[in-house]
UniProtKB/Swiss-Prot annotation:
InterPro entries assigned: Glyco_trans_19 (IPR003835)
Pathway named in the protein's UniProt entry: Glycolipid biosynthesis; lipid IV(A) biosynthesis; lipid IV(A) from (3R)-3-hydroxytetradecanoyl-[acyl-carrier-protein] and UDP-N-acetyl-alpha-D-glucosamine: step 5/6
Keywords: Glycosyltransferase, Lipid A biosynthesis, Lipid biosynthesis, Lipid metabolism, Transferase
Protein name: Lipid-A-disaccharide synthase
Membrane-spanning segments: none
Gene Ontology molecular function, alphabetical: lipid-A-disaccharide synthase activity; phospholipid binding
UniProt cross-references to NCBIfam families, sorted A to Z: lpxB (TIGR00215)
């Protein structure tokens, strides 16, 4: 920071989740340093907080190998241009928000020019391709991690890392209002309720929906009043799910929801879901769950050799034990899924114990992440 100019922070966000994090960070920094300047690659939320966008975030938001290859020349041009322009600007700190394939190389380029760099949101290096930790260590002055076990991993390799808590844990109440969520969804307060979340990607919905629906049919035999809610992330996934349901369980009555995943979790006595961020959100919603996941045999074979963790779901990784049942590949079949869900729908000891542990884990990662991230940026800027 120099006296001639305000605190200058450069940021690059590559997708909507990064734009939300970036906006929260900018807001927290502006409260401390009102005249700070923010520049870089920003989405609408970051721009609304006052970030100058040298490039729109959509330029980086490409998914899949084919799409990335098609845009590779443009992506490389943007990264080279940012390296040059940030090098000339000499910001007090550069913050790369997620988008590791783009940002970590950029961070390394800038660090070589004497610019302090932060990588915000750890890639899953603790789970697979662990050698990436060495590249991250060379490229960044600090990693900001959402989860405590991520910091423990970086500590092993002497890479500076700060656990800041999870923004989702900050955003969700410790004690959600189940009846209020049921009122929103039109679910009777006294009914048993199951949420089915077969994933956000097309391949997941294709692989999991049939077994999830058959599981719900089995559970209806025990709980005839069972209300089934199925939140789907967009119209495409909804069409896909409806097609599969018409083939597998045409007579099964369900509530199809456009989005509203969080409301569905809060309203439900139990959830059956694919792994991923949904499992963390379900934990924070205090909804007992079973994780069911299947992928193509070769992909699973490869994953077993690459993935270094004992569990796949974040609640189990946070707890350090099998807190929630994980049924993968051939284990992910209706009889076993239903058997794991039955004690949760009973609302007895099993689900109460799970609920209490979920609450403890929520408190552990509820640390006001925006404020913690802002503090880390300012300390590095000194």
């Amino acid at each position: 920071m120099t006296e001639q100019r305000p605190l200058t922070i450069a940021l690059v966000a590559g997708e909507t989740s990064g734009d939300i994090l970036g906006a929260g960070l900018i807001r927290a920094l502006k409260e401390r340093v009102p005249n700070a300047r923010f520049v870089g690659v920003a989405g609408p939320r970051m721009q609304a907080e006052g970030c100058e966008a040298w490039y729109e975030m959509e330029e980086l938001a490409v998914m899949g190998i084919v799409e990335v290859l098609g845009r590779l020349r443009r992506l490389l041009h943007i990264r080279a241009d940012l390296t040059k322009r940030f090098g000339e600007l000499k910001p007090d700190v550069f913050v790369g928000i997620d988008a590791p394939d783009f940002n970590i190389t950029l961070e390394g380029n800038l660090k070589k020019q004497g610019i302090k760099t932060i990588h915000y949101v750890s890639p899953s290096v603790w789970a697979w391709r662990q050698k990436r930790v060495f590249k991250i260590g060379r490229a960044t002055d600090l990693v900001l991690a959402f989860l405590p076990f991520e910091k423990a991993f970086y500590d092993k390799y002497n890479v500076p890392c700060r656990f800041i808590g999870h923004t989702m844990a900050d955003a969700m109440p410790l004690d959600p209002d189940k009846n209020a969520a049921r009122d929103v969804l039109g679910i009777p307060h006294d009914a048993h309720c199951l949420a089915l979340l077969p994933g956000s990607r097309g391949a997941e919905v294709e692989m999991l929906s049939a077994d999830f629906l058959k599981t719900a049919q089995l559970l209806r035999q025990t709980y005839p009043d069972l209300e089934i809610v199925v939140p789907l992330v967009n119209a495409k996934r909804r069409e896909q799910f409806e097609r599969i349901k018409a083939e597998v369980a045409p007579d099964l009555s369900v509530h199809l929801l456009d989005g509203m995943g969080r409301e569905a979790m809060v309203a439900s006595d139990a959830a059956l879901l694919a792994s991923g961020t949904a499992a963390l959100e379900c934990m924070l919603a205090k909804c007992p769950m079973v994780v069911g996941y299947r992928m193509k045999p070769f992909t699973f074979w490869l994953a077993k050799r690459l993935v270094k963790t004992e569990y796949v779901s974040l609640p189990n990784l946070l707890a350090g034990r099998e807190l929630v049942k994980e049924l993968l590949q051939e284990e992910c079949e209706p009889q076993k899924l239903a058997a794991a869900l039955l004690p949760l729908l009973a609302n007895g000891k099993t689900s109460h114990a799970m609920h209490d542990t979920f609450r403890e884990l929520h408190q552990q990662i509820r640390c006001n992440a925006d404020e913690q991230a802002a503090q880390a940026v300012l300390e590095l800027a000194q």
